């Protein structure tokens, strides 16, 4: 399992709509946080090993209504 974080910039006034649509329609999303700064949302996803991250982001995240831009962070190791 691979953990991927996606920062999402939304069109004005669309943050809550994007978050609600994403959590309801994209099954690989674990959590969504609203954030301050350049991006409006931080989405935590768990993808299967070997799954094409680019296709996932392109097909599932960037196509959500109200998404303006994304920035993807690929993780290596979780420390606890």
Task: Describe every region a protein language model picked out.
Residues 1-80:
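A compositional/biophysical signature of low hydrophobicity enriched in polar/charged and small residues
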